[in-house]
Design a protein with these regions (language model features):
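Extracellular/periplasmic metallocenter environments
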Residues: 23-34, 80-118
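N-terminal edge beta-strand
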Residues: 26-50
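Short, solvent-exposed loop/turn positions at domain surfaces
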Residues: 39-40, 73, 85
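Beta-strand cores of secreted/periplasmic/IMS beta-sandwich domains, seen most often
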Residues: 43-61, 85-101
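Short, surface-exposed beta-strand/strand-loop-strand elements in extracellular ectodomains
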Residues: 64-70
């Protein structure tokens, strides 16, 4: 009997964990990122939780997208002219995140920014 109850409890806990993961994935915020000549624009201020960044290169120069904060760093591949990429990050409330393009001297020419997840 004890083995059956333990097995049942383990099944319930596993199902609850899977439901939480599925809910988290379905409620991910989407932020569109437009990279052009020495400029990066975010469509919205990212909030805490799972955020999917959809990045589009709107210029004829190569660009990538880096995001750092909370002890983590995420990056996309370099996109060619009119290329797209995406990355998904889990942002922590109250943490400052910085983002930039690391291609050549793009960051020092203004392709950077920051936000606090609130």
């Amino acid at each position: 009997m004890k083995l059956i109850l333990t097995s049942l409890l383990a099944t319930i806990v596993a199902a609850a964990s899977l439901a939480a993961v599925a809910k988290s994935a379905s409620t991910a915020q989407t932020v569109r990122v437009i990279e052009s000549s020495y400029s990066i624009r975010l469509s919205a201020k990212p909030k805490p939780g799972t955020v999917k960044f959809l990045v589009r290169n709107a210029s004829d120069d190569g660009h990538d997208f880096w995001l750092r904060g909370g002890g983590r760093t995420w990056k996309t591949r370099v996109m060619g002219e009119t290329g797209t990429a995406s990355l998904t990050a889990v942002l922590k409330r109250g943490v400052k995140y910085t983002y930039w393009c690391a291609v050549g001297s793009h960051r020092s020419k203004g392709m950077s920014g920051s936000f606090v997840a609130r």
